[in-house]
Structure formats: C-alpha cells, structure tokens
Amino acid sequence: MTTEIKKLDPDTAIDIAYDIFLEMAGENLDPADILLFNLQFEERGGVEFVETADDWEEEIGVLIDQEEYAEVWVGLVNEQDEMDDVFAKFLISHREEDREFHVIWKK
C-alpha cells in the first residue's frame, strides 16, 4: 500500500528554503557573495519555487524521486526578471515527518 505524500505548497517550501539559506549562507558562501546578496536583495532578490530538476543525482550522488521533493532557488534577478545569479538551490522533501533537504551552494 502506497501512502500519498502531502506536497509542500510553494509558499511553505520558499519559507523553509529561505530560513535555511539565512542560517547557513555565512558558512557556505564567499564573503563577497554575501555582501552582494545583502546589498542587492531588496531590489533584485528572489526566492523561487521551480520545477524539480532531474540532475540532482549528479549533484548529490543519490537517486531521488522528483515527486517527493520541491526545488527552490535563492538569488538575484536581472532586468528581464530572470534569476541570473543563483546563490543556492534547495531540494526539500515533501515528507513533513522526515523533512530532509539538500543544498547546492554557489561556488
């Protein structure tokens, strides 16, 4: 018997990702990127819920079921409203009782 996973709504996934970003950015981003983010976030900052990519296995070394995870990006958007400077990509489990996440930080 398969149990249905209640998926995160986009706003909740965004909140979780942004909270993790704020908590961990200082340890994982270059100081210049942190400064850039802080200076420009009010004007150009974005936290976007995106379609879960199929290349996470390459990034984290674990095969994932795209239906069980939400993907959120944190970064800066350009004049065309496209996120062109991604500081972190989050993969967040929809499972509330076992909320795991993976992060790919800007290098």
UniProtKB/Swiss-Prot annotation:
The function of this protein is:
May act as a double-stranded DNA (dsDNA) mimic. Probably regulates the activity of a dsDNA-binding protein.
UniProt family annotation: Belongs to the putative dsDNA mimic protein family.
What's the domain of life for this entry? Bacteria
- In Swiss-Prot or TrEMBL terms, this protein is called Putative double-stranded DNA mimic protein CGSHiGG_01135
